[in-house]
Design a protein with these regions (language model features):
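A short, N-terminal "cap"/entry segment at the start of jelly-roll beta-barrel domains
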Residues: 1-33, 44, 77, 121-128
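Conserved short histidine dyad/triad with adjacent acidic residue
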Residues: 33-51
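Short beta-strand His + acidic residue motifs that chelate non-heme Fe in jelly-roll/DSBH
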Residues: 43-46, 64-66, 86-87, 93-98, ...
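Glycine- and acidic-residue-biased ligand/ion/polar-headgroup-sensing regions
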Residues: 49-69
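Short, surface-exposed beta-strand-loop junctions and turns on beta-sheet-rich folds
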Residues: 51, 70-72, 110-112
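Short acidic-glycine-tyrosine-enriched beta hairpin
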Residues: 68-89
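Double-stranded beta-helix
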Residues: 94-128
Length: 128
């Protein structure tokens, strides 16, 4: 059986922190580029119940924040070009770009808009 090849541009989704380029999203997997256009751009601390994701830092660097689900404490680490990170289901996480035009290649299980649970907007420092 011959399966036709589908060539098309990615879907662009505008975000407050930049934009996403959706390469593919279906019941098997999702692939996206997350483009943080400005330094210190960030998405909210959030988690997913259905989605498991892996990030590859393609360009730039980020402060990667997460909440330890065992003790509720915040933790953070600088991640840079060439690093990869696995985000398990239910793991609260956040990225803050440290350079303009920082890019993450994300591969995950299927993306559902309703599967994003925000804990807070802004950065941990905004909570103080």
């Amino acid at each position: 059986m011959i399966i036709p090849i589908d060539v098309k541009p990615p879907k662009r989704v505008e975000k407050a922190w930049g934009h996403e380029l959706w390469i593919h999203n279906d019941e098997e997997y999702c692939g996206k580029l997350l483009v943080f256009e400005k330094e210190m751009a960030n998405f909210s601390m959030h988690y997913h119940l259905k989605k498991k994701e892996t990030w590859y830092i393609q360009q730039g660097s980020f402060q990667f924040n997460w909440i330890d689900v065992e003790d509720g404490l915040h933790d953070s680490r600088i991640i840079k070009e060439g690093d990869s990170v696995l985000i398990e289901r239910g793991q609260p996480h956040q990225l803050i770009s440290l350079q303009e035009n920082s890019i993450v290649f994300e591969v995950s299980t299927q993306h559902f808009d309703e599967d994003s649970y925000r804990i807070y907007r802004g950065t941990p420092n905004d909570l103080l």
